[in-house]
């Protein structure tokens, strides 16, 4: 059976079939007993069997795994929790195997696909406070430190700022066992118990700050965009916190301003950027390097059954000369200074790796997270091959609202390099200092100051000694539906044919 279709992956998906048969088949297609309560598990298995990057490496996802429908039904019923079932059919997922031995660290599921889809546009319930969480000494107690605050958010109206600390929520000490429920639970309002740091010791203070999460909040990922004069050199500085396609024009406008200011150097600050849109990463790279549409930005690799259907041309993404709405404003740089840390992942790393064959990428900060795979959004719409399409929400199984964001491929640069699962290492190593986080965009903020020192060639005037490294085990951004996802948002070819 053959299926010809056109679709968009990522947030907005358009699907058009040119045949009347009942879906792609890649081998025997098992069906569960209709009386079994396994709709979610059935959807998950079939979607992952088709699209999952490591499908061939997971025995339970093999096309010939089940010889009878009864065997398939029993397999699905064996795990009644859909989320646990999903992670069990991933390739050694971190949720089961832990960080040290996991292969798949990033695929995830959401029991409400509408929440997942909204997050891809940067829409979420938020109070606007972004923070890291660390451990207090050798205990299970947790402290938080404020990294930045969204403009025009609830937090922006409260007495709290970057560099402050907290240890309690609603009077309860944060621990590794309760922080998720206290900070990221269903409570829309909570009160932070603040703390101070002196001599590497965190002490509770009497200060309290109450914050309220607001529905449908949208973070503008461009936190700071300014041009600095460094000993006569015009240096553009961009603090960019997530790759969101809905802000592509704002990003292009920022580069237009950099050009108008005469910027000849760029410091791209992605220290807190967990990723996002692959296409937006391509546009940003073009704004930095150039708009030659014959230069390869990245190449994709899917699982074997999908890869075989794509042409080399489709699998290759080139630098762009347009955002789709306007001509790209490019600085045409021969080098770039990137501030990146362990909080920098996926599309952030993609920009660095994609630019590396063409210009000198000077990485200042820490080793990045190490995420080189991309994902797509899957829902229980079997007639659309499980791809989410905003125009087909009425066709999604009303009894199953689960949405999946599995890893379905990886990216490599023009030189073929892709192996950075351990992260990208900095040329200039420097951690944030909890005792001196500084003001983002200020020339004295330590990481920016180090980049400017490299640009100017001036001898050190700032002491870069780190007294208390900002070591976190998680951050607020990793507890949003989008997490550190890198999603593909490009159309597949109209002549795609799967057997």
Which residues fall in each region the model found?
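Active-site-proximal loop/turn and secondary-structure-junction residues that shape catalytic pockets
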Residues: 215, 272-274
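Positively charged n-region of N-terminal signal peptides that target proteins for export
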Residues: 1-4
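Flexible, low-complexity junctional segments that flank or bridge functional domains
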Residues: 19-265, 280, 290, 470-499
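C-terminal "post-core" interaction segments
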Residues: 246-253, 258-265, 274-499
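C-terminal motif of bacterial Sec signal peptides marking the signal peptidase cleavage site
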Residues: 14-17
């Amino acid at each position: 059976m053959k299926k010809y279709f056109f679709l968009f992956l990522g947030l907005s998906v358009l699907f058009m079939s040119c045949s009347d048969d009942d879906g792609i088949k890649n081998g025997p297609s098992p069906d569960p007993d209709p009386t079994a309560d396994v709709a979610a598990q059935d959807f998950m298995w079939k979607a992952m069997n088709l699209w999952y990057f490591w499908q061939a490496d997971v025995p339970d996802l093999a096309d010939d795994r089940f010889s009878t429908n009864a065997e398939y039904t029993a397999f699905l019923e064996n795990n009644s929790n859909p989320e646990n079932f999903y992670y069990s059919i991933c390739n050694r997922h971190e949720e089961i195997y832990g960080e040290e031995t996991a292969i798949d660290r990033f695929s995830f599921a959401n029991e409400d696909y509408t929440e997942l889809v909204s997050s891809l546009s940067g829409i979420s319930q938020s109070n606007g406070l972004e923070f890291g969480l660390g451990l207090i000494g050798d205990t299970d107690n947790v402290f938080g430190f404020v990294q930045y605050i969204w403009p025009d958010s609830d937090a922006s109206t409260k007495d709290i700022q970057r560099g402050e600390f907290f240890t309690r929520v609603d009077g309860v000490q944060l621990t590794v066992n309760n922080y998720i429920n206290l900070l990221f639970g269903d409570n829309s309002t909570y009160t932070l118990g603040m703390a101070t740091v002196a001599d590497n010791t965190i002490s509770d203070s009497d200060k309290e700050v109450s914050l309220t999460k607001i529905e449908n909040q949208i973070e503008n990922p461009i936190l700071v965009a300014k041009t600095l004069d460094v000993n006569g050199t015009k240096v553009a500085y961009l603090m960019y916190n997530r790759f969101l396609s809905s802000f592509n024009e704002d990003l292009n406008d920022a580069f237009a301003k950099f050009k108008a200011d005469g910027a000849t150097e760029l410091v791209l600050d992605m220290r807190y950027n967990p990723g996002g849109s692959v296409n937006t990463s391509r546009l940003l790279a073009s704004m930095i390097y150039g708009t030659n549409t014959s230069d390869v930005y990245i190449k994709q690799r899917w699982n074997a059954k999908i890869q075989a259907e794509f042409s080399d041309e489709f699998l290759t993404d080139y630098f762009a000369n347009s955002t789709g709405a306007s001509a790209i404003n490019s600085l045409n740089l021969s080098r770039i200074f990137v501030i990146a840390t362990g909080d920098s992942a996926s599309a952030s790393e993609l920009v660095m790796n994609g630019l590396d064959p063409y210009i000198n990428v000077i990485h200042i900060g820490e080793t990045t997270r190490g995420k080189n795979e991309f994902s797509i959004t899957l829902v229980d719409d079997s007639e659309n091959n499980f791809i989410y399409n905003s125009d087909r929400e009425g066709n999604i199984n009303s009894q199953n609202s689960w949405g999946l964001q599995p890893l379905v491929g990886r990216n490599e640069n023009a030189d073929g390099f892709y192996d950075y699962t351990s992260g990208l290492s900095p040329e200039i190593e420097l951690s944030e200092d909890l005792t001196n986080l500084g003001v983002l965009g200020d020339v004295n903020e330590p990481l920016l100051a180090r980049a400017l020192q490299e640009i100017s060639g001036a001898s050190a005037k700032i002491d870069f000694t780190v007294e208390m490294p900002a070591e976190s085990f998680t951050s607020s951004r990793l507890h949003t539906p989008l997490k550190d996802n890198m999603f593909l948002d490009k159309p597949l070819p109209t002549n795609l044919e799967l057997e």
